[in-house]
């Protein structure tokens, strides 16, 4: 593994940068120094939540004191005095000032937060509920302490009093916890939807999906489909979980450290040291796990893709009787995933060994420190249970990394996969994660929008290759001057069409063409979308551009008069690539030309599955339509429908000749 590759699997600044670039846009635009503003907004939101929680706590305490004065006089005197002291202190004024300042921060960013208020509102509600849940946990720790002390002292009145309080707290807590969990998942779903649409927008922009094709030798971005589906779902859910877990840990740490400090300072400091030790060891082990989890995601995706390929090419495999080879290839992918998974479970076992020892040993520490204090009469019996609870809560907060290291390493792997994907989508289309240069220095073919298709001194090469397909080619295809491109297989005929479409730009020279909306490309194997027959016909238009009569007339024109009736109408939904023969699919593709009526149609052996008579009828119909066509083909009969012929020869040579019909 190279040093650059090793850096992909470390807890470092690059990992943080990729995380921010992926996570921040949902809440705040990404830009120079914008991350600081984003983090400042989160801090301001926390200030708002803390201030509102403070006022709510004081108000509820005063309200409860007014309703149950006898109870608070006997059992909650310290609480009432503390709240009263808080009210008389500068704290309320500080809270009001903090609220005003935090509000001003959000108001100052209102333009950049447009259409983002819902996520901030949900996040604020979640933080508020998190504060409430932590407050209820603190209350329960004291309730348990009083219950245990009452049982030990056989004080029935206090026992039943606090048992009723426990019941009330549970009744209040259950709907709050349910609401918290629901909103947590809801925000995760909304975030996933937004982030997926954000990635899809970039994936389809500038034909990035083509340049990032995982079948290409020129990209290191494997399985973009998995990154958009599984990795984004994992990223949004786990990010939200970790964010709230970290905040929960901070609140728990503050709340229960104070309780622990009042019981035993020795216990508190020993706990902090123990947690730091566990975190350091967990991170050291986890760094190795990031790479293993990254590989597991990649290998599982490759295995799944192998099965998808078999499903999509079942008929071809059956004709070739290639079941044995296909099974071997799919099994090899499975074994690759299994080998890596075996390595993964070894490391997971090592982490589990450390985690179990770490967690079991922690149960001894409170008793070792607290028992002598109780036996000496310095603590009441209920303090033992409260100390154990507080110790466990604080340890859980401090040991977040230790206990979640396996999830964190899986999360880091997802961050790296999404980060690489995001960086590639933002890069120039001809620089998308390609391997190192082969040593052949390419220029770039220039594309110019014009009224015709014309090539000026075009030299074309495959991406990252020194092979010359066509050298210094100049030609013009004026309206009606149909062009036929012929030549031996592998000579570069289809590559020339890719250059005209703007898919390939390795080489030099200038290509003039109309806007892509005025061009329609028909490959040899037509693309059948997942949609109705109507949607097949109007593709690539998203909305219907013709009425039913015109669509049916077009089907008749391409010699498919009974197709709609055969499948139950234009709105029938089928797996068209399976139920239609290749010849029928090619005629559907030609129907798209008659429906969309482009100025130029480029046919890459688009009639190869048709008989000569069908081919002749369709070319005559295209001529009557007024669309200028550029065809790639091998049949000599194609010359009857074109005005000029470009013959692509070996070593970049070519010849243009007129066709006299």
UniProtKB/Swiss-Prot annotation:
What GO MF annotations does this protein's record show?
ABC-type transporter activity; ATP binding; ATP hydrolysis activity
For the ligand (ATP), the binding residues are: 487-494
Q: Name one Pfam family in it.
A: ABC_membrane_2
One cellular component term (GO) for this entry is: plasma membrane
Record carries keyword Cell inner membrane: yes
Task: List the transmembrane segments.
Answer: 37-57, 87-107, 120-140, 158-178, 243-263, 266-286, 341-361
Q: Where in the cell is it found?
A: Cell inner membrane
Q: Which SMART domains match?
A: AAA (SM00382)
Q: Which InterPro entries match?
A: AAA+_ATPase (IPR003593), ABC1_TM_dom (IPR011527), ABC1_TM_sf (IPR036640), ABC_transporter-like_ATP-bd (IPR003439), ABC_transporter-like_CS (IPR017871), ABC_transporter_sub-D (IPR050835), P-loop_NTPase (IPR027417)
Entry keywords, A to Z: ATP-binding, Cell inner membrane, Cell membrane, Membrane, Nucleotide-binding, Transmembrane, Transmembrane helix, Transport
Q: List the disulfide bonds.
A: none
Instruction: Specify the protein's topology with respect to the membrane.
Output: Multi-pass membrane protein
Q: Where is the ABC transporter domain?
A: 453-659
What this protein is called in its record is: Uncharacterized ABC transporter ATP-binding protein sll0182
UniProt family annotation? Belongs to the ABC transporter superfamily.
Domain (ABC transmembrane type-1) spans 123-410
On whether Cell inner membrane is a keyword of this UniProt record, the answer is yes
**SUPFAM superfamilies attached here?**
ABC transporter transmembrane region (SSF90123), P-loop containing nucleoside triphosphate hydrolases (SSF52540)
């Amino acid at each position: 593994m190279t040093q650059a590759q090793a850096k992909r699997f470390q807890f470092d600044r690059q990992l943080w940068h990729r995380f921010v670039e992926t996570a921040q846009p949902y809440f705040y635009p990404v830009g120079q120094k914008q991350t600081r503003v984003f983090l400042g907004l989160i801090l301001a939101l926390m200030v708002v939540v803390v201030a509102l929680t403070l006022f709510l706590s004081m108000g509820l305490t005063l309200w409860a004191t007014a309703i149950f004065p006898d109870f608070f006089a006997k059992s909650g005197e310290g609480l009432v005095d503390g709240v009263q002291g808080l009210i008389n202190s500068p704290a309320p004024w500080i809270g009001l000032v903090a609220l005003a300042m935090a509000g001003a921060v959000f108001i100052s960013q209102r333009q950049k937060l447009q259409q983002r208020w819902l996520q901030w509102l949900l996040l604020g509600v979640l933080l508020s509920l998190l504060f409430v849940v932590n407050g209820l946990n603190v209350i329960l720790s004291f309730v348990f302490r009083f219950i245990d002390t009452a049982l030990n002292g056989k004080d029935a009145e206090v026992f039943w009093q606090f048992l009723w309080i426990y019941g009330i707290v549970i009744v209040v807590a259950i709907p709050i916890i349910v609401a918290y969990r629901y909103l947590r998942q809801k925000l995760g779903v909304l975030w996933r939807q937004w982030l997926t649409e954000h990635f899809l927008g970039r994936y389809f922009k500038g034909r990035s999906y083509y340049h990032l094709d995982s079948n290409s030798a020129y990209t290191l971005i494997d399985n973009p489909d998995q990154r958009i589906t599984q990795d984004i779902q994992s990223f949004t859910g786990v990010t939200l979980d970790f964010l709230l877990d970290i905040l929960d840990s901070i609140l728990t740490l503050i709340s229960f450290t104070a309780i622990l400090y009042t019981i035993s300072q020795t216990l508190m400091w020993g706990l902090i040291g123990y947690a730091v030790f566990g975190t350091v060891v967990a991170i050291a082990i986890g760094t190795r796990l990031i790479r293993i989890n990254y590989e597991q995601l990649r290998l599982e995706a490759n295995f799944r893709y192998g099965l998808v390929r078999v499903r999509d090419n079942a008929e071809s495999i059956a004709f070739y009787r290639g079941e044995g080879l296909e099974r071997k290839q799919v099994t090899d992918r499975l074994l690759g995933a299994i080998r890596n998974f075996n390595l993964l479970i070894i490391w997971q076992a090592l982490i589990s060994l450390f985690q179990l020892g770490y967690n079991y040993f922690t149960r001894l520490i409170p008793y070792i420190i607290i028992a002598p204090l109780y036996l000496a009469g310095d603590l009441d019996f209920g303090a033992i249970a409260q100390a154990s609870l507080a110790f466990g809560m604080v340890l859980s907060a401090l040991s977040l990394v230790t206990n979640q290291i396996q999830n964190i390493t899986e999360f880091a792997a997802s961050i790296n996969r999404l980060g690489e994907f995001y960086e590639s989508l933002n890069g120039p289309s001809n620089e998308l994660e390609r391997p190192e240069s082969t040593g052949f220095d390419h220029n770039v073919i220039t594309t110019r929008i014009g009224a015709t298709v014309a090539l000026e001194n075009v030299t074309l090469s495959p991406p990252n290759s020194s092979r010359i397909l066509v050298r210094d080619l100049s030609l013009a295809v004026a309206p009606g001057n149909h062009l036929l491109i012929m030549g031996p297989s592998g000579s570069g005929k289809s590559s020339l069409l890719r250059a005209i479409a703007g898919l390939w730009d390795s080489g030099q020279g200038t290509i003039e063409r109309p806007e892509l909306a005025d061009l329609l490309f028909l490959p040899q194997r037509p693309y059948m979308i997942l949609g109705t027959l109507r949607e097949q016909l109007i593709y690539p238009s998203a909305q219907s551009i013709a009425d039913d009569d015109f669509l049916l007339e077009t089907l008749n024109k391409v010699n498919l008069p009974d197709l709609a009736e055969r499948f139950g109408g234009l709105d029938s939904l089928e797996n068209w690539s399976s139920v239609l023969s290749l010849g029928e699919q090619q005629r559907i593709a030609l129907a798209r030309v008659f429906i969309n009526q482009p100025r130029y149609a480029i046919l890459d052996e688009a009639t190869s599955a048709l008989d000569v008579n069908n081919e002749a009828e369709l070319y005559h119909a295209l001529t009557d339509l007024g669309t200028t066509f550029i065809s790639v083909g091998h049949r000599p009969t194609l010359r009857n429908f074109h005005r000029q012929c470009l013959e692509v020869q070996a070593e970049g040579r070519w010849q243009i000749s007129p066709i006299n019909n």
